[in-house]
Curated annotation (Swiss-Prot):
The lineage of its organism: Bacteria, Bacillati, Actinomycetota, Actinomycetes, Kitasatosporales. Residues 336-348 have a biased composition (Pro residues). This is Serine/threonine-protein kinase PksC. CDD domains: PASTA_pknB, STKc_PknB_like. It comes from Streptomyces coelicolor (strain ATCC BAA-471 / A3(2) / M145). The active site is at D151 (proton acceptor). ATP binds at L26, G27, E28, G29, G30, M31, A32, S33, V34, K49. InterPro entries: Kinase-like_dom_sf (IPR011009), PASTA_dom (IPR005543), Prot_kinase_dom (IPR000719), Protein_kinase_ATP_BS (IPR017441), Ser/Thr_kinase_AS (IPR008271). Residues 300-403, 435-485 are annotated as: Disordered. It holds the Pfam family Pkinase. The gene is pksC. PROSITE patterns: PASTA, PROTEIN_KINASE_ATP, PROTEIN_KINASE_DOM, PROTEIN_KINASE_ST. One of its GO terms (molecular function) is protein serine/threonine kinase activity.
């Protein structure tokens, strides 16, 4: 969102029967404008975001926007811009939704980065890691409440005059993707191209790990002064997110230690399961890495480029459901978390094990290698390759001096790539991600997968505080696209005992698959299918499959 500071089109107007008096325009973007305002009831300054009039024409969208604002208002954290109120009012004869927010005296992170780039070429790594850790602290809170941001970028992060990080615009991207406005058609996604995760670019369902990818993009930008993927068109940028590998940040900024390269590389994995399992885990790693090296001024490599999208001309991007089937086989080099003793600190990829996968396979424990010497980590089971073709159920501030990266609506990018010389065909292979898992006998059946009945060395006990309310099952969220359907709740990271109580209250059926994993402890739900947010018919509720941790470390 650009910063203005002048008089906006609504300056001098009032909202909510005169309670909120709009003053200076603070910023304006593709979806909304933000004004400084005075709350005459509580005698304080606030910031008011008014959605552009074309977005408020349909009642269904306004209702979705209101519900999202209510959800965001429940988020309370030092690093989150508070939401005080929401409503709609007539401005220039048009119904205009608005949100009343905490007024942050400061400037966007993009402006802070611009200054660092002018002075040093990039932001110092220790400063960037601390800011990133604070952003992740905010996301940790929102993810625990089931709210995915969907549009993390420097323009949505504020820095106060005292250096406090504030993340804003939670829920705005989700409200935009309601599928009910004239601007948003089926198979379309909303976001900022430079920060989209591969699954967002593909129009697939997203979860907390999509935000972590966007945080990885932002961290790359902070420590290098440029974006890992940038091109002349949103389509080319989205193609790069799905198909291209980013350069190591140290190839741009020679002052960066290998641990920063490894941290960013993990955050930017195409397969969500190969990223950090949670905002908390990524935050801990940022702080660990920040404490592991001596801070040094950035040393930018002259002429280093990160241009992308060269292969987009040979790719076809039809709407979801209209793509040609991709050939079978692995999509990308399988994940191997064990570092090798050789010059490559990230290890030599090992063949992927063949196993059924439904959506996202189990995330194995992994820690970014230490800067020197590289710590030998315990190898985790290699997850199946991530299927980059659309699933059958298909859920629905740029670099300094760079191109505009305002939020735009992009066609869902199905990577049904035209085979050119056999090369593209080798890139896109179906890793079995759309195969159905073996059917279980009953709703409470449990299939044990490499689970050990005893507590192995490294065992982590259960965290029974991670609970889910029963009403998440008995009164689930109604689908935004079909009033006759509901959305599957988010059970990930919750304790299985609490989840079972939720299921029993609603009369739902589950299938539990035990997996060896000691990141969150015994009984923690690590994955689910259908994924959270999937639209289902409550009259024909499918069996929900849950991957649950045994608390034991992954077998070597």
């Amino acid at each position: 969102m650009s910063q203005d500071g002048g008089q906006g089109r609504y300056a001098g107007r009032a909202l909510a029967g005169g309670r909120y008096q709009l003053r200076d325009l603070l910023g304006e973007g593709g979806m909304a404008s933000v004004h400084l305002a005075y709350d005459s009831v509580l005698d304080r300054q606030v910031a008011i975001k008014t959605l552009h009039t074309e977005l408020g024409r349909e009642q269904a969208f306004r209702e979705r926007f209101r519900r999202e604002a209510q959800a965001v208002a429940k988020l309370t954290h030092t690093n989150i811009v508070s939401v005080f109120d929401t409503g709609e009012d007539d401005l220039d004869g048009m119904t205009t939704p608005y949100i009343v927010m905490e007024y942050v005296e400061g400037r966007p992170l993009g402006s802070v980065l611009d200054e660092d780039v002018r002075q040093q070429g990039a932001m110092p790594a220790d400063k960037a890691l601390k800011i990133t850790a604070d952003v992740l602290a905010a996301l940790e809170i929102s993810h625990e409440m089931g709210l995915v941001h969907r549009d993390i970028k420097p323009g949505n992060v504020m820095m106060t005059k005292r250096g406090v990080v504030k993340v804003m615009d939670f829920g705005i991207a989700r409200a935009m993707q309601s599928g009910v406005t004239s601007m948003t058609q089926t198979g379309m996604v909303v976001g900022t191209p430079q920060y989209l995760s591969p699954e967002q670019a593909l129009g697939r369902g997203v979860d907390a790990r999509s935000d972590l990818y966007s945080v990885g993009i932002m961290l790359f930008q902070l420590v290098t002064g440029r974006l890992p993927f940038d091109a002349d068109s949103p389509l080319a940028i989205a193609y790069a997110h799905v198909q291209e590998q980013p350069v190591a940040p140290s190839a741009v900024n020679r002052a960066l230690p290998p641990a920063v390269d490894a941290l960013v590389a993990r955050a930017l994995k195409k397969n969500p399961n190969e990223r950090f399992p949670s905002a908390e885990a990524m935050r801990d790693e940022c702080l660990r890495v920040a404490a592991s090296f001596q801070a040094a001024p950035p040393s930018i490599v002259p002429g280093a480029q990160t241009s992308s999208g060269a292969g987009v001309g040979s790719a076809v991007f039809p709407p979801v459901g209209q793509g040609t089937p991709a050939p079978t086989g692995p999509v990308q080099t399988p994940y191997q978390p064990t570092p090798s003793p050789g010059p490559n600190p990230y290890g030599t990829p090992a063949p992927a094990a063949h196993s059924p996968a439904y959506g996202y396979p189990q995330q194995a424990g992994y820690q970014t290698p230490a800067p020197a010497p590289y710590a030998q980590q315990q190898a985790a089971a290699t997850p199946p390759p991530y299927n980059l073709t659309p699933s059958a159920q298909g859920s629905g501030s740029g670099s300094p001096g760079g191109k505009s990266n305002k939020p735009v609506i992009i066609g869902s990018i199905v990577v049904a790539v035209v085979a050119v010389g056999g090369l593209i065909g080798a890139l896109l292979m179906n890793g079995g991600g759309d195969e159905d898992p073996e059917a279980g006998g009953g709703g409470s059946s449990t299939a044990s997968v490499s689970a050990s009945p005893s507590k192995a060395a490294g065992y982590r006990g259960p965290d029974k505080e991670k609970t889910i309310e029963k009403d998440k099952c008995t009164e689930p969220q109604e689908s935004y696209n079909d009033p006759d359907k509901i959305q599957v709740p988010d059970f990930t990271f919750k304790y299985i005992g609490s989840v079972k109580e939720c299921f029993n209250a609603a009369g739902w059926q589950m299938k539990v698959v035990e997996v060896d994993e000691n990141t969150y402890g015994e009984g923690s739900v690590r994955d689910q299918f259908p994924t959270a947010g999937t639209d289902v018919d409550p009259e024909n509720m499918p069996e929900i499959q849950l991957k649950v941790s045994t608390g034991n470390p992954p077998s070597e």
